[in-house]
């Protein structure tokens, strides 16, 4: 029977699944959990238990769209691309207005207009290396009386309480309808680092008989691309993962389940609760190095090394190594330190197939 890996071994094997050039190596003093956080592109775990605000439906849809089990039914997923939004990216954040529930409406600057609001989006958790590819403002207005037919909404950059900034857009705003507007290139610059804060001034312009309304919801859907987490283009074979069978002790895929609860991350990781990382283990001696039907063909160099090792073992040369041949990605949905819902996509996290190299 194969030995059972301890918790530290689980973390170490998971780290070994990722290319060593993806991010800077962790200092030797780091523990397994801290090193894993760095590999996942997180400076630290959330310091406190989040409020567990409801996960927005759009984030669930994006997460399920990235689920490899569902993706194989249709067309293959493109690495570092958010298909549902049609943009490049590997990180999606749903950022609510940081003070909507407690911030009162401000008096209108012009007589005859409805009160105004200032919405603030905290983007301080975005890394400097990330580049925005979509910044979608989402607003919902509700009527305060039944005779409201709708309004015209003006969105401007906030300058100060006395002088509004430049107007970004002006759109019809029917009550109860979710309004969406792209702010990339206006409030959020394209191909540049994301600002720490986006502050917007909202103004309602009622019709001839319309009453004023209230701001019920305000959020920002931010998609960014972190090139450090994007692999080089390569040919992928989209086949079902399997735990290979073969003679005991030969090179094949072994099951390894990584549980976020065991690492202590279940309070802020929304989904998945864990995943099968798997790992490679076994010997690469002849004739096992020459894989049979259904397995990946060994390199000629690996076959030659196995043959030479069997005929005349050379000290220090050794036999071929059992390594991952095919890997697949996972996506993780979690709360960050600002209670934002974040979806991150990670390539090469699951070992699907092993071979001798």
From Swiss-Prot:
Tagged with keyword GTP-binding: no
Maturation-removed propeptide residues: 24-237
Pfam families according to UniProt: TGF_beta
Keywords, in A-Z order: Cleavage on pair of basic residues, Cytokine, Disulfide bond, Glycoprotein, Growth factor, Secreted, Signal
Known tissue expression: Expressed almost exclusively in the nervous system.
A GO term for molecular function: cytokine activity
Compartment(s) of residence: Secreted
Gene3D superfamilies per record: Cystine-knot cytokines
Keyword Disulfide bond assigned: yes
Disulfide pattern: 251-322, 280-354, 284-356
Similarity comment: family membership: Belongs to the TGF-beta family.
Quaternary structure and partners: Homodimer; disulfide-linked.
Miscellaneous section: This protein is produced by a bicistronic gene which also produces the CERS1 protein from a non-overlapping reading frame.
Protein name per its UniProtKB record: Embryonic growth/differentiation factor 1
């Amino acid at each position: 029977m194969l030995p059972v890996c301890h918790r530290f071994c689980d973390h170490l094997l998971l780290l070994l699944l990722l290319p060593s050039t993806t991010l800077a190596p962790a200092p030797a003093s780091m523990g397994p959990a801290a090193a894993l956080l760095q590999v996942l592109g997180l400076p630290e775990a959330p310091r406190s238990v989040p409020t567990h605000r409801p996960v927005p439906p759009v984030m669930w849809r994006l997460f399920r769209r990235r689920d490899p089990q569902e993706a194989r039914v249709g067309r293959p997923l493109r690495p570092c691309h958010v298909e549902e939004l049609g943009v490049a990216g590997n990180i999606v954040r749903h950022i609510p207005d940081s003070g909507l529930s407690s911030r009162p409406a401000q008096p209108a600057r012009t007589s005859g207009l409805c009160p105004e609001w200032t919405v603030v989006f905290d983007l301080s958790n975005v890394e400097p290396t990330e580049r925005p590819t979509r910044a979608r403002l989402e607003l919902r207005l509700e009527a305060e009386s039944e005779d409201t037919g709708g309004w015209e909404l003006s969105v401007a950059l906030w300058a100060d309480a006395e002088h509004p900034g430049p107007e970004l857009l002006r759109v019809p705003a029917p009550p109860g309808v979710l309004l969406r507007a792209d702010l990339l290139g206006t409030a959020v610059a394209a191909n540049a680092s994301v600002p720490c804060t986006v502050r917007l001034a909202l103004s309602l312009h009622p019709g001839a008989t319309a009453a004023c309304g209230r701001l019920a919801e305000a959020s920002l859907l931010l998609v960014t691309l972190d090139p450090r987490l994007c692999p080089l283009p390569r040919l992928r074979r989209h086949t079902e993962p399997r735990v290979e069978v073969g003679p005991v002790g030969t090179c094949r895929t072994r099951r390894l389940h990584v549980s976020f609860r065991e690492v202590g991350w279940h309070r802020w990781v929304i989904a998945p609760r864990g995943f099968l990382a798997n790992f490679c283990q076994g010997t690469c001696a002849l004739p096992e190095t020459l894989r049979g039907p259904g397995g990946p063909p060994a390199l000629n160099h690996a076959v030659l090394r196995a043959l030479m090792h069997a005929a005349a073992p050379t000290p220090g040369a050794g036999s071929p190594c059992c390594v991952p041949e095919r890997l697949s990605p996972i996506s993780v949905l979690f709360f960050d330190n600002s209670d934002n819902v974040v979806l991150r996509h990670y390539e090469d996290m699951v070992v699907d197939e092993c071979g001798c190299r």
